[in-house]
Curated annotation (Swiss-Prot):
Function: DNA-dependent RNA polymerase catalyzes the transcription of DNA into RNA using the four ribonucleoside triphosphates as substrates.
Catalysed conversion reaction: RNA(n) + a ribonucleoside 5'-triphosphate = RNA(n+1) + diphosphate
The keyword Acetylation is assigned to this record: no
Quaternary assembly: The RNAP catalytic core consists of 2 alpha, 1 beta, 1 beta' and 1 omega subunit. When a sigma factor is associated with the core the holoenzyme is formed, which can initiate transcription.
Binding site for Mg(2+): D449, D451, D453
Cofactor(s) the protein requires to work: Mg(2+); Zn(2+)
Binding locations of Zn(2+) 2: C777, C851, C858, C861
Protein name (Swiss-Prot/TrEMBL): DNA-directed RNA polymerase subunit beta'
SS bonds (residue pairs): none
Gene: rpoC
Lineage, broadest ranks: Bacteria, Pseudomonadati, Spirochaetota, Spirochaetia, Spirochaetales
Binding site for Zn(2+) 1: C60, C62, C75, C78
Organism: Borrelia recurrentis (strain A1)
Top-level lineage group: Bacteria
Sorted UniProt keywords: DNA-directed RNA polymerase, Magnesium, Metal-binding, Nucleotidyltransferase, Transcription, Transferase, Zinc
Pfam families: RNA_pol_Rpb1_1, RNA_pol_Rpb1_2, RNA_pol_Rpb1_3, RNA_pol_Rpb1_4, RNA_pol_Rpb1_5
C-alpha cells in the first residue's frame, strides 16, 4: 500500500458494490477462524492467509517458500503470496450476500434516509425490510397504487384477482428496485414546485427530502448503493484473535458478528439452491438482514446481540462512537513516550526558566541521548554495553547526563490542562530525591499547589520541537494571561506576606524619624541592627528628602536598576500592578529579573517575620451584643406589622433576612476597624487578609464576627442566622444548620469541574478552525464601545474594551482639530490617555464580530494578542485561545446562585435612593402623581441627571475664562481667582453656572426608578452628594391608583379568581388573586366616577394581594394591590455556569418575556385561550399582535408608548427574539453583555474579543427566506459565505439573488453543522454525521485543527501553516570571492 502523506482534502462517499469487490483480495466463504490444533488460519475463513496475507514474514502457508527473495511469488500449493505479515492490516475481503440487505445507517437512523427518498415512513420501511409487508412496485392496470403496502392476506387476494398484471415484493430487493427506478431530477423539480405552492407553511419533511435529493445529485452516489449486495470484511489485524495463557482465545467482537452473517448467508444460499418453501427463505433473509444490522450498529437495535458474558457486542459503529471510540480515544488523544510523572515540591532556589527533575527520572528520560554521547565519547562501542553502564549508574553517566540536559528543554504539564499555560517548557536542573521541583511563581498558571499535586514531564526530541519549546513555550515567554493580558506570573501567599511586612510602616520603633543621605546608609544601619525595617525615615532622593520606611528602601534597592523607587505598602494587588507597569515600560527581560528578586525577598522576609496566630489575635467586637439587640428589636417591629396585617408573610421574611444581612455587614465593618487598629496594624490575621496573602474579610467575619445567614437544601435562606462565631463556638442547632452548606459546597465543586470541562470541549469544537489567516479583510463595519457604567461608577473603563484594537474611523481632537487616531490605526495605552484627556469616551473599533475574512479572522479585526501584547501574528489559533479563555475560569463560576429577594448574596437591598456625587436633576420620565408635596411614580420612571464633578463659588472668581454650556477638557483654563492665580480644569465635562456657582457637569445620565418610588426633589434642583432623594419598598411592587373615584371589582370572584386565606399566625384574612388561568375571566380593578363611568382599569396579575374592598372610595396615590417580591424566589434565576451554558446553547429561557415587535402605542384586547392579546399599533396604524400568558405581571398599561424591543411583561429575554426584532448587532451586544456579566460578578476578567469569536461562529449561518434563481431550498440553513458566493454568481448571470435572514445556532448544534465532517464526527453523534456526509459526498478541506490531528498532519496554525510548509532553503550561487 503506498504511503500517502501529502494530500489536501479528504472525501467520503457511499461505496458501490463494484468498489467493495475491487478492494477485496478474495471472498470469505466460511465462518471458521483458526484451526484449534494447528493454531493456523482456516482456508476461506475469516483469517484466511490466501485472502488476507501470510501470518509469517516472507513465508507461504505450507512452507514451500521461505525467504525474502521469493517476495511477491504466489505459492502453487497453498495459493498464499509471499509478503510481509503487515499486509494483514491493509488487505480486505468480502462476502457475496445471497440476498440484498439494507444498510442500518440509512434506514434506521431518524430521519430514515431511504424513507425520505421514497416517502415511506420509518415503521412501514421496517415492515418491508423485515418481510412483514409487500410493497407495490408496478401497479399495471389494476386498482392498486404504486408504493401501496399490502399484508399477506391483501397480497393473496390481489394475486387471485389480478394475476400477474402487477408486481409487488418485500425485503431489501423491493426497496432496491424502487431506489433504482427513482428519477432524482424529476423528483427534485416536483418538490420545489410543492414548496412554492405551500410557501410559508413548508413542512420540514419537504425541506429534508429536497436536501437529500440534491446531495445525491451533487455527490454522484446512487440511491441503490444504500442496499448492499456485497459486504466488505475488514483486515484481520484490525479484529485480532489472540491466545491467552490458559490456551483460551480472546477475540474481537467483530469476528463473532461476522460469523453470524456468514453462517446465515451460507444457510440462505443452500435454502435457495434447494428451492425451499418461501416462508423459510423469507425467515432466513430476515435473519440475514438482522445480522448485518448487528455488524454495522449493534447498539441501535431494539434487541441487542450479546456475547458470552451477557455483554452487548461492540459493532463497527460502536468502535467509532463516544469517548472510547476510535476518534476520541486513539486519534485525538494519544499516549506519549519519553514522559514521566511525579509529585511536585516547591523550588524556591530555581530561576523562573528552570525546574528540578529527579536525577533517576532524567536518566531514564534522556537515555537515548546519553547512550549516543557514551558511544561518541568511545566509553563504549555498542548500545547494549551503554545500557548496562547506565544501569550501573557510573560517574561518567552522570557527567554526560549533566551535559545532555543543558539547554535541552522539558515540558511540564499539570492535569487538568484548562488553558495553554497548563503546559510550559523549562530548562531542567538535576535534583536529589524523587520529586519534581517547581518554581513557586508559575503555580498560578498551572493552578498547582504543593499538597500532593502531581505533574508530568515530556521531552521534546527533535531539534524543531526543542526550538519551538524554547521560543514559544518557555515559562519566561508566558508571563501574561492570554484571556486578558494581565500578568499571570505573580507572587502569592508567603511571598506577598513577606513583602507586605517589609514595606509596612510602624510607629515608635528603632530609628524612627532619622534622615539618611542615600540608600546605602539605610542598608548599613539595618545591617548594624540600629534601624527597624518598619521605621519611618527620610531619605534623600535627588535634591529632596522623601518620607519612606527602611523596608521600602531595602525592596527598591534590590530591584533592577531601571525601576523607580516604590514607596508604598505592597499588597498582592499592588505587586501585580507593579509587575504590569514594569512589563509595559521596560519589557519582559526586566520583569523576569524582577520576579526572581521578588520571590527571593518575599521568602526571606516572611521567614524573618515568622508570623503566628493565637486565639487572642481573633478579636470579637464588644459592640456585637448591641448590634444583635438592635436587630432583634427591628425584627419584633416587623413581626408586629405582620400580625396587624400591614405586610404579607413574604415581605416579613424578606425584611427579616435584610435586617440580619445589614447587621452582619455593620458588625463586620466594626470588627475590621478594631483589627486594623490592633498592634498598629500588625495583627497577623488582619495582615494576612489585607495583604491578600490568605483569607478574606468573609472568613474573618466567621472567626470574629458572626457566621450569618445560611441556606437550606432548597436554596431558601433560613431566617434565623448563626449569631455565634467560631471563636465563641456554635450551639448544637447552629452547628447542625451549618453542616448543610458545607456538604453542598463539596458536591457543587465536583459537579462544577465536569461541567466546566464539557463547556470547554464544546467551545473548542466550535472555534477550533478560527485562525488568523489574512492581514486585512477590508471591512468598513465596526462596533461601538464605551466604558461600562452602573449609574455613576465605572465597572469597566474604555481602556479595557478598546486597547489593542484598531480604529475604524478617524478621530480628531475637539479642541485643536488634529488627528488623534487614524483609520486602521492600533489603539494603544497612550492613545487612550490622549482620548481621555480630550473627553472622548466612545469609539467605533474593528471587531471579530464584523470581520469579513472568509475563513477565520484577519489581523486587523482581531487586534492585539494578549499573551505578548503585540499585534496578533498570522497563523495564531485564536479560536482555541478564545475557547480556553472562556472555559478555564468556568470552574470558578458558581453552579447556581439562589436569588432570594435580592439578599443573601448581595447583602441587603436598600429602600432609599441617594447618589454618591452632587447632581442637578435635568428631567423626569414616567407617569407620576403629586402626593403630600412629593412625586409618586405609579409606573416605572427615569431620572435624567447631570453629575456635578467640580464646583466653585462665583464670589472667589476674579475673571471667568469659560462660558455656560461650554465643553472643557483637562488642562483648560477656567478662571483667575481673587489672588490672581489661573485655575486649570482637572476634569472633562461641560460648564454650568447656577446659584452663584461655577460647576463642571457630566453628560446626562439616566437612573431608573421602581414603581411606587416617592421622590422628594423637583426638576432643576441642585442636590448635594449623599442626600436621600426618594424612597421605595424593595420587597413589594405596588399597583397605585392614578385617579380619584370608587373601586369596582371585575371578574374577581371568590373561589375562582380570588382566594381568601386566614393567616394562622396572625388571624388576618389575606385576599390574593389566584395564579390559575381562566379562558374568559380577566381579574381587574376598575375605578369609576360619580356617574358610574369607568375612568381607569388595572389588570391584576396572579399572586397579587388586594389592598382595597369593592365599592371603597379611593384617592390618587393609594395602593390598590401589591405584588410581593418573594414570588420571584420560586422562579430560581440561573446564574454562574448554567447561565453561561444556556447563553452559548441559545436555549429559550423558562420564564419568557414578550418583547414589543415594533415601536408604537399599546392597546389591550381580551383574553383568548388563557393568553392576553396586546396589540402594538405602529406609526402607519398597523396592528402587531403579542400574546402574553394571563396571570403574568405586565410592565405596560393600555395607551403606553413602547419602543421595539421593550419588555411587555416580566421574564427573561429570548436571544432569538432579540435577533428577530433588533437585528444581529443588538444580539451580539446582548450575548456579550450577558456572558460578561456572569464572569464579572465572579471577578473574572475575559476580553470581549474571545467571547466575540464564539458568537461569530454561532452566527455563521443564514436561513433562506426567498430562493430566487439559486439552487437553495426555502428555509434551508446555509453558510453565510456560500450564500454570498452563489448570489454573486447568479447576479453575474443576470438572475434573481436569494434572500436570507441571520440565525443564531447554539454551540453544540453549530459544531455538528460545521463544514468539516471529520471534526463534526469526532465531536458528537458520530454515525449520524458520517451518514449524512457520505450521502452528500462531503469533501473535508482539512482547514481546522481537529481534522488535521485526526489524520496525522501538522496542524495548520503557527509553524504548521501551508504558508511555511513550502519554504525551501536555496544555496546562494554567487561563488565569487
Amino acid at each position: 500500500m503506498k504511503e500517502i502523506k501529502d494530500f489536501e482534502k479528504i472525501r467520503i462517499k457511499i461505496a458501490s458494490p463494484d468498489q467493495i469487490r475491487s478492494w477485496s483480495y478474495g471472498e470469505v466463504k466460511k465462518s471458521e477462524t483458526i484451526n484449534y490444533r494447528t493454531l493456523r488460519p482456516e482456508k476461506d475463513g475469516l483469517f484466511c492467509e490466501r485472502i488476507f496475507g501470510t501470518t509469517k514474514e516472507w513465508e507461504c502457508y505450507c512452507g514451500k517458500f521461505k525467504s525474502i527473495r521469493y517476495k511477491g511469488i504466489i505459492c502453487d500449493r497453498c495459493n498464499v503470496e509471499v509478503t510481509h505479515f503487515k499486509v494483514r492490516r491493509e488487505r480486505m475481503g468480502h462476502i457475496e450476500l445471497s440476498a440484498p440487505v439494507a444498510h442500518i445507517w440509512y434506514y434506521k437512523y431518524i430521519p430514515s434516509r431511504i424513507g425520505l427518498l421514497l416517502d415511506i415512513t420509518a415503521s412501514n420501511l421496517n415492515s418491508i425490510l423485515y418481510y412483514e409487508k409487500y410493497i407495490v412496485i408496478e401497479p399495471g392496470d389494476t386498482d392498486l397504487k404504486k408504493m401501496q403496502l399490502l399484508n399477506e392476506d391483501e397480497y393473496s387476494e390481489a394475486k387471485e384477482r389480478y394475476g400477474m398484471s402487477f408486481s409487488a415484493s418485500m425485503g431489501a430487493e423491493a426497496i432496491k428496485t424502487l431506489l433504482e427506478n427513482l428519477d432524482l431530477d424529476e423528483l427534485s423539480s416536483k418538490l420545489r414546485l410543492q414548496m412554492i405552492d405551500k410557501d410559508d407553511k413548508t413542512d420540514k419533511k419537504l425541506l429534508r427530502r429536497l436536501e437529500i435529493i440534491e446531495n445525491f445529485k451533487i455527490s454522484g452516489n446512487k440511491p441503490e448503493w444504500m442496499i448492499m449486495d456485497v459486504l466488505p470484511v475488514i483486515p484481520p489485524e484490525i479484529r485480532p484473535m489472540v491466545q491467552l495463557d490458559g490456551g483460551r482465545f480472546a477475540t474481537s467482537d467483530l469476528n463473532d458478528l461476522y460469523r453470524r452473517v456468514i453462517n446465515r448467508n451460507n444457510r440462505l444460499r443452500k435454502l435457495l439452491l434447494l428451492n425451499a418453501p418461501e416462508i423459510i427463505v423469507r425467515n432466513e433473509k430476515r435473519m440475514l438482514q438482522e445480522s448485518v444490522d448487528s455488524l454495522f450498529d449493534n447498539s441501535h437495535k431494539r434487541k441487542v446481540v450479546k456475547g458470552t458474558s451477557n455483554r452487548p457486542l461492540k459493532s463497527l459503529s460502536d468502535a467509532l462512537k463516544g469517548k472510547q471510540g476510535r476518534f476520541r480515544q486513539n486519534l485525538l488523544g494519544k499516549r506519549v513516550d519519553y514522559s514521566g510523572r511525579s509529585v511536585i515540591v516547591v523550588g524556591p532556589e530555581l530561576k523562573l526558566h528552570q525546574c528540578g527533575i529527579p536525577a533517576k527520572m532524567a536518566l531514564e528520560l534522556f537515555k537515548p541521548f546519553v547512550i549516543r554521547k557514551l558511544i561518541e565519547s568511545e566509553a563504549v562501542f555498542n548500545i547494549k554495553r551503554a545500557k548496562s553502564l547506565i544501569e550501573q549508574e557510573v560517574d561518567e553517566v552522570w557527567q554526560i547526563l549533566d551535559n545532555v540536559i543543558k539547554e535541552h528543554p522539558v515540558l511540564l504539564n499539570r492535569a487538568p490542562t484548562l488553558h495553554r499555560l497548563g503546559i510550559q517548557a523549562f530548562e531542567p536542573v538535576l535534583v536529589e530525591g524523587k520529586a519534581i521541583k517547581l518554581h513557586p511563581l508559575v503555580c498560578h498558571a498551572y493552578n498547582a499547589d504543593f499538597d500532593g499535586d502531581q505533574m508530568a514531564v515530556h521531552v521534546p526530541l527533535t531539534p524543531a520541537a526543542q526550538a519551538e519549546s524554547w521560543a514559544l513555550m518557555l515559562s519566561t515567554n508566558n508571563l501574561l494571561n492570554p484571556a486578558n493580558g494581565h500578568p499571570i506570573v505573580f507572587p502569592s501567599q508567603d511571598i506577598v506576606l513577606g513583602l507586605y511586612y517589609l514595606t509596612m510602616e510602624r510607629k515608635n520603633v528603632m530609628g524612627e524619624g532619622r534622615k539618611f543621605s542615600n540608600f546605602n546608609h539605610v542598608l548599613l544601619a539595618i545591617n548594624n541592627k540600629s534601624l527597624d525595617y518598619n521605621a519611618q525615615i527620610y531619605v534623600k532622593v535627588g535634591e529632596e528628602y522623601i518620607k519612606t520606611t527602611a523596608g521600602r528602601v531595602v525592596f527598591s534597592e534590590a530591584l533592577p536598576g531601571k525601576i523607580s523607587f516604590v514607596n508604598k505598602t505592597l499588597s498582592d494587588y499592588e505587586l501585580q500592578t507593579l509587575i504590569s507597569e514594569v512589563y509595559v515600560i521596560y519589557g519582559s527581560s526586566i520583569v523576569i529579573e524582577m520576579l526572581d528578586i521578588i520571590k527571593e525577598l518575599g521568602f526571606r522576609y516572611a521567614t524573618k517575620f515568622g508570623c503566628t496566630i493565637s486565639m487572642s489575635d481573633i478579636i470579637v467586637p464588644q459592640e456585637k451584643k448591641v448590634y444583635v439587640e438592635k436587630a432583634n428589636r427591628e425584627i419584633a417591629k416587623i413581626q408586629n406589622d405582620y400580625t396587624k396585617g400591614v405586610i404579607t408573610g413574604e415581605e416579613r421574611y424578606n425584611n427579616v433576612v435584610s435586617v440580619w444581612s445589614k447587621t452582619n455587614e455593620e458588625l463586620t465593618n466594626k470588627m475590621m476597624e478594631i483589627l486594623k487598629k490592633d498592634r498598629d496594624g500588625f495583627n497577623v490575621i488582619y495582615m494576612m487578609a489585607d495583604s491578600g496573602a490568605r483569607g478574606s474579610r468573609n472568613q474573618i467575619r466567621q472567626l470574629a464576627g458572626m457566621r450569618g445567614l445560611m441556606a437550606k437544601t432548597s436554596g431558601d435562606i433560613i431566617e434565623l442566622p448563626i449569631i455565634s462565631n467560631f471563636k465563641e463556638g456554635l450551639s448544637v442547632i447552629e452547628f447542625f444548620i451549618s453542616t448543610n452548606g458545607a456538604r453542598k459546597g463539596l458536591a457543587d465543586t465536583a459537579l462544577k469541574t465536569a461541567d466546566a470541562g464539557y463547556l470547554t470541549r464544546r467551545l473548542v469544537d466550535i472555534a477550533q478552525d478560527v485562525v488568523v489567516r489574512i492581514e486585512d479583510c477590508g471591512t468598513i463595519n465596526g462596533i461601538k464601545v464605551e466604558a461600562l457604567k452602573n449609574g455613576e461608577e465605572i465597572i469597566e473603563p474604555l481602556r479595557e474594551k478598546a486597547v489593542g484594537s484598531y480604529s475604524i474611523e478617524r478621530i480628531k481632537s475637539p479642541i485643536t482639530g488634529e488627528i488623534i487616531l487614524d483609520v486602521n490605526e492600533e489603539i494603544t495605552e497612550d492613545k487612550i490617555k490622549l482620548l481621555e484627556t480630550v473627553g472622548i469616551d466612545k469609539l467605533v473599533i474593528r471587531s471579530v464580530l464584523t470581520c469579513e475574512a472568509e475563513h477565520g479572522v484577519c489581523q486587523k479585526c482581531y487586534g492585539r494578542d494578549f499573551s505578548n501584547n503585540k499585534p496578533v501574528s498570522i497563523g495564531e489559533a485564536v479560536g482555541i485561545i478564545a475557547a480556553q479563555s472562556i472555559g478555564q475560569p468556568g470552574t470558578q463560576l458558581t453552579m447556581r446562585t439562589f436569588h432570594i429577594g435580592g439578599v443573601a448574596q448581595a447583602g441587603s437591598e436598600d429602600d432609599k435612593i441617594a447618589l454618591k456625587n452632587a447632581f442637578i436633576l435635568n428631567g423626569l420620565e414616567g407617569f407620576n402623581v403629586q402626593v403630600d408635596g412629593g412625586l409618586l411614580f405609579t409606573r416605572k420612571g427615569v431620572l435624567r441627571i447631570i453629575n456635578v464633578i467640580y464646583e466653585e463659588s462665583i464670589k472667589k472668581i476674579k475673571k471667568l475664562k469659560v462660558s455656560d454650556s461650554q465643553k472643557v477638557i483637562k488642562g483648560m483654563s477656567l478662571f483667575i481667582d481673587k489672588s490672581g492665580v489661573e485655575v486649570l480644569s482637572s476634569h472633562i465635562g461641560y460648564i454650568k453656572i447656577k446659584d452663584n456657582k461655577l460647576m463642571i457637569v457630566s453628560e446626562e445620565q439616566e437612573i431608573s426608578l421602581k414603581v411606587g418610588t416617592r421622590l422628594e426633589i423637583n426638576v432643576g434642583d441642585y442636590v448635594e452628594a449623599g442626600r436621600v432623594i426618594g424612597t421605595f419598598d424593595p420587597f413589594a411592587e405596588p399597583i397605585i391608583a392614578e385617579v380619584k373615584g370608587k373601586i369596582k371589582f371585575k371578574d374577581i370572584i371568590l373561589g375562582t379568581t380570588l382566594k381568601e386565606e386566614i393567616n394562622l399566625e396572625t388571624g388576618n384574612i389575606e385576599k390574593r388573586i389566584t395564579d390559575q388561568v381562566f379562558e374568559s375571566l380577566d381579574p381587574r380593578i376598575l375605578i369609576i366616577n360619580d356617574r358610574g363611568v369607568e375612568i381607569a382599569s388595572y389588570v391584576l396579575p396572579g399572586d397579587a394581594y388586594l389592598q382595597v374592598e369593592d365599592g371603597q372610595d379611593i384617592d390618587i396615590g393609594d395602593i390598590i394591590a401589591k405584588l410581593s417580591k418573594g414570588s420571584e424566589k420560586t422562579q430560581d434565576i440561573t446564574g454562574g455556569l448554567p447561565r453561561v451554558n444556556d447563553l452559548f446553547e441559545t436555549r429559550i429561557p423558562k420564564n419568557l418575556t414578550e418583547m414589543a415587535k415594533v415601536s408604537g402605542v399599546v392597546q389591550f384586547k381580551a383574553i383568548q385561550k388563557g393568553k392576553r392579546l396586546i396589540n402594538v399599533i405602529d406609526e402607519y396604524g398597523v396592528e402587531h399582535k403579542h400574546y402574553i400568558p394571563a396571570g403574568k405581571h405586565l410592565l405596560v398599561r393600555d395607551g403606553d408608548v413602547v419602543r421595539a424591543g421593550d419588555m411587555l411583561c416580566d421574564g427573561r429575554i429570548n436571544p432569538h427574539d432579540v435577533l428577530e426584532i433588533l437585528g444581529g448587532i443588538s444580539l451580539q451586544e446582548f450575548l456579550l453583555a450577558e456572558i460578561q456579566d456572569v464572569y464579572r460578578k465572579q471577578g473574572v476578567s475575559i476580553n470581549d474579543k474571545h467571547i466575540g469569536v464564539i458568537i461569530k461562529q454561532m452566527m455563521k449561518k443564514v436561513k433562506i427566506v426567498s430562493v430566487g434563481d439559486t439552487n437553495f431550498v426555502y428555509n434551508q440553513k446555509v453558510d453565510k459565505h456560500a450564500f454570498y458566493e452563489q448570489n454573486k454568481r447568479v447576479i453575474e448571470q443576470g438572475g434573481e439573488p436569494a434572500v436570507a435572514s441571520p440565525i443564531l445556532i447554539g454551540i453544540t448544534k453549530a459544531s455538528l453543522n460545521i463544514d468539516s465532517f471529520i471534526s463534526a464526527a469526532s465531536f458528537q453523534e458520530t454515525t449520524k454525521v458520517l451518514t449524512d456526509a457520505s450521502i452528500a459526498g462531503s469533501i473535508d478541506d482539512l482547514r481546522g485543527l481537529k481534522e488535521n490531528v485526526v489524520i496525522g498532519h501538522l496542524i495548520p496554525t503557527g509553524t504548521g501553516m501551508n504558508l511555511y510548509k513550502r519554504v525551501k532553503v536555496r544555496e546562494n550561487s554567487n561563488s565569487e570571492v
